[in-house]
Amino acid sequence: MQKVRNKQKGMIAGARVLGASLILSTSLLAPFATVYAETGEGRVPNVTLPTGVPTNYDLTWFDEFDGNKLDRTKWDYSLSSFDPKARTQMHFTDDPANVSLKDGILHLTALYTPKQLKWNPNTKKNEWVDRENTYKDPKTGQTITYKAPFTSGAIQTRDRHGKVLTEFVGDFYAESRIKLPFSESSWASFWMTGTKGGGSPKSGEIDVFESKGYDPKFIQANIHTAPTQEKDEKKKKTQEKYSDQYQQKLPNNGDTQTAFHTYGVLKQGDKVTFFYDGQAVYTLKYSQIKNKEAFVNPENGFILRLTHIVGGSFVKDFDGGTRNYTDAIPYKDSYKDGSRSDMQIDYVRVWQPNAKPVTTEEPTTTTTTTTTTV
């Protein structure tokens, strides 16, 4: 595992890499320093950091998605269901119908796929059955099963067995250029979770953005930490919650589903700053966070995640709104061919301070593979 260290402070401030690491970036950036890096699948263009990102940050990891297969040294597929307690209605797969690369774009495509092949131990055959999700109700202990007739795509810099491929430690700036899906129940996001502290939310979570397909103007950044339990004086009991959250809607002109935009986050020693199209739009200081351990722990790294969820409790109006698309089944036609339900990622890049920039004299080749499970 490679460790890139901060040359000034002598402490970890870079990416721990197994195989490779991930970077998120934007096409609107223009160069502050010339960076040429080849993977055998494309040369990194000259880029410039947005105003507000320190000029001593160097490009240390990237994926331009210029090949025809996912680079498995950098990413792995998320598989099966995700967050069924929120009543999400999809299964993540590694099927090319859900995760594909074409013309330099990564596509995470959600589709209405109501049936799946499942092994029947009685007949000893694979049989077509309804696609479903299951979870255990924490209050009653009852097992809940519900229809989940969609498939979709999600990737991360940790493999399906829990092995970290890349984590970014200390200060970094990460950015991605993305066009969002506009199917009503789509919940697309670029986010990060910490590797130390027992899993999210205790290990920290950074939502660079989350979106709602039915509302192109809804773009929200968020920070999750371990929850601070609060006592409800009226009910004389402690209110349980999943996490402490520090969300902020990001200003935009509403064309997030028809044009590419860049979404970035700058994590520093005392604060996190979110960027939209190269402009700083929201800063959260650690002094404002009640449970800040995950963000001040010098050993806690963050993996990168790109996700296209369908349905679930997030896809509705809050603050008195009436729109509700938590159940995607009435909108299944919006997921028939992928034309409306396609999350498109142009590239991802990460910069880190005082680190050795990515430069190569000669192209290097990358072997990529993919697998499909039923």
Predicted regions and their residues:
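Long, low-complexity Q/N-rich tracts
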Residues: 366-372
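Sec-dependent signal peptide cleavage junction
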Residues: 26-43
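Non-Sec secretion/translocation targeting segments of pathogen effectors
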Residues: 1-3, 22-24, 36-37
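GH16 jelly-roll
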Residues: 38-365
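Bacterial Sec-dependent N-terminal signal peptides
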Residues: 1-17
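Hydrophobic helical h-region of N-terminal Sec-dependent signal peptides
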Residues: 18-24, 28
